[in-house]
Regions:
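Beta-strand-loop-alpha "switch" segments that mediate conformational coupling across diverse proteins
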Residues: 101-134
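Inter-lobe coupling/hinge region of RecA-like P-loop helicase motors
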Residues: 125-152
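Inter-motif core of Ras-like GTPase G domains
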Residues: 37-56
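P-loop/Walker-type NTP enzyme "switch/lid" segment
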Residues: 1-27, 32, 36, 138
Length: 174
């Protein structure tokens, strides 16, 4: 897996192409706002993963991203599969607001990952210490093992989705 984090509108396509030559899976992490870099990355995607926390504001932003994906699909005259990934979820309870948001996505025909990223210190620590959850020091950060298991479950689901998309030849969107 290759992660692309700091591309610009001018370099994003070349960065994706170069990464594809090096690895089977390329993840492009871009800001949530619509931009040419985001549109370019979407146009090259096998799967667009839209992040959403359990708030209506986040759900509204996710909906904007989904609309951008659908516009790009029309421009390119091809299907661009996407799914919503719920983030910073509580492992013990699912608040009513989150249930409502997930139901709205479901009713709109938007796929949601079965795996969510649970709100864990280890995931927040990545921004401070860098690297991945596997690189974190258990003396500095708690819950690494649970974060690794959560990340692994998500990785498995992403890979299975991509394999399914490739088998089916894409996904239809209106």
């Amino acid at each position: 897996i290759k992660l692309i984090e700091k591309s610009t509108e001018e370099t994003i396509i070349d960065d994706i192409d170069n990464a594809q030559e090096q690895t089977a899976f390329v993840l492009v992490d871009l800001e949530g706002t619509a931009s040419m870099a985001v549109a370019s990355a979407i146009s090259r995607a096998d799967l667009v993963i839209t992040l959403c926390q359990g708030s209506q504001d986040d759900a509204d932003e996710a909906a904007k991203t989904i609309k951008l994906v659908n516009r790009q699909a029309k421009v390119l005259n091809r299907s661009i599969p996407f799914a919503v990934l719920m983030t910073r979820t509580n492992p013990a309870i699912t608040p009513r607001t989150l249930k409502h948001i997930m139901n709205e996505f479901h009713e709109a025909g938007v796929e949601i990952f079965k795996t969510s990223l649970i709100d864990r210190e280890a995931f927040r620590a990545i921004r401070s210490f860098g690297g991945t959850v596997n690189d974190l020091d258990p003396k500095q950060v708690s819950g690494i093992d649970k974060a690794v298991a959560n990340a692994h479950a998500l990785a498995v689901e992403v890979i299975e989705r991509i394999k399914g998309i490739k088998r089916e030849g894409g996904q239809k969107h209106d």
